[in-house]
């Protein structure tokens, strides 16, 4: 499990997906700087990559190949993937722009990156998608971004999630603001995602806003 603590990334291990997770040596896998939002991606050739966010001239998404033991990155492979540069990604026109929360999936010959932009406290926090032919890019942001925002979810602060499949259906689980007037405590939501071909015969995500719903914990 890759996680963030005190703006550093670490890896913990477990024999079961439900834990407990432990670290033999409690230290970050990247020695310098500040990093958040790790996502471990294993490609079809079994190479392991760490997509993550570096706090440098804004929140920017990077990739690096992981060492075989997961306890560090191969520094020479570090490369920036993308940063906020379009209007929807910086609706508040701030100098410290934000692109974060990367999730990577491969469909056919293309890599898809779901990412979020704007500060998470901004009602316009939203999800965009970029594609690449190679895991190191270049990454091209799709026309139609953002694909998930308060405009089709009905909730402010919709973003920073993960993609998973149940049966034949894909879903995206993400944060939202507590309400359209309060940011915290943030809530968790789920929304079905379909992939449809656009005019260029490229698969693009289609979020079903009518089925967007908040997840609630059961009392036990």
Regions found by a protein language model. Give the residues of each.
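Carbohydrate-active catalytic/glycan-binding domains of CAZyme proteins
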Residues: 1-220
């Amino acid at each position: 499990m890759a996680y963030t603590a005190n703006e550093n990334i670490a890896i913990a291990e477990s024999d079961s997906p439900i834990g407990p997770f432990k670290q033999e040596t409690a230290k970050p896998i990247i020695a310098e700087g500040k990093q958040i939002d790790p996502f471990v991606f294993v490609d079809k050739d079994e190479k392991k990559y760490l997509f993550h966010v570096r706090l440098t001239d804004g929140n920017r998404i990077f990739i690096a190949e992981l060492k075989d033991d997961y306890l560090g990155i191969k520094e020479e492979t570090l490369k920036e993937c993308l940063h906020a540069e379009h209007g929807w990604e910086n609706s508040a026109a701030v100098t410290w722009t934000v692109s974060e929360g990367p999730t990577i999936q491969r469909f056919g010959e293309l890599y898809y990156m779901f990412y979020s932009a704007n500060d998470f406290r901004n009602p316009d926090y939203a999800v965009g998608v970029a594609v690449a032919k190679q895991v190191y890019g270049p990454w091209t942001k799709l026309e139609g971004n953002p694909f998930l925002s308060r405009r089709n979810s009905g909730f402010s602060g919709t973003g920073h999630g993960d993609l998973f499949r149940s049966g034949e259906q894909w879903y995206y689980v993400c944060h939202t603001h507590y309400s359209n007037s309060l940011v915290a405590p943030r809530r968790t939501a789920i929304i079905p995602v379909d992939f449809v071909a656009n005019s260029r015969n490229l698969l693009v995500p289609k979020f079903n806003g009518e089925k967007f719903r908040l997840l609630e914990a059961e009392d036990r």
